Amino acid sequence: MKGLYQAAGRILVTLGILSVCSGVIAFFPVFSYKPWFTGWSVRIACPIWNGALAITTGVLLLLAYREWTQRYLGEATFTFVILSIMGCPLHFAIALESALLGPYCFYSFSGIAGTNYLGYAVTFPYPYAKFPLACVDPPHYEEYHLTLQALDLCLSFTLLCTSLTVFIKLSARLIQNGHINMQLPAGNPNPFSP
């Protein structure tokens, strides 16, 4: 059982870092240095904030495992696991919506009446194979966009599964003992045994 909490903490930290990196990379489309390509949107901010929640949850879980006598670490872990569970479906929904609508093209459909979103100009879901060169600048933006959204879908689902596992184990301990941190019986060195 002790390996479960360590593994879950490490998984949450690793996937949280990947999620933050995904949001930061999405900030600069196709690694472009052109400042007019940068911009905040809900698609970029959601992976960053969900990744920050996962990193915080993972670090608290690892610290709670290491210093199990500190009651506040277990309670903070439980709180952040709940927040992470609430953020993961939102992250998943935004990534799915973004993948289905298509990429945000900066110059393809812009203008006086343009919306900049290909999702409003082409059929739904976005036909990546039939309409490969809709975004003229930056090049290969469709593939870049689809790869980032697929990565976000996988990250959000894995973060949700890991957070749910930790939540279920901590909830079982809370129901069984009346609190998250348990008193150790004499001779039991493992604070995380059920």
Curated annotation (Swiss-Prot):
<protein>
    <recommendedName>
        <fullName>Transmembrane protein 212</fullName>
    </recommendedName>
</protein>
<keyword id="KW-0472">Membrane</keyword>
<feature type="transmembrane region" description="Helical">
    <location>
        <begin position="148"/>
        <end position="168"/>
    </location>
</feature>
<feature type="transmembrane region" description="Helical">
    <location>
        <begin position="44"/>
        <end position="64"/>
    </location>
</feature>
<keyword id="KW-0812">Transmembrane</keyword>
<dbReference type="GO" id="GO:0016020">
    <property type="term" value="C:membrane"/>
</dbReference>
<feature type="transmembrane region" description="Helical">
    <location>
        <begin position="99"/>
        <end position="119"/>
    </location>
</feature>
<feature type="transmembrane region" description="Helical">
    <location>
        <begin position="76"/>
        <end position="96"/>
    </location>
</feature>
<keyword id="KW-1133">Transmembrane helix</keyword>
<feature type="transmembrane region" description="Helical">
    <location>
        <begin position="11"/>
        <end position="31"/>
    </location>
</feature>
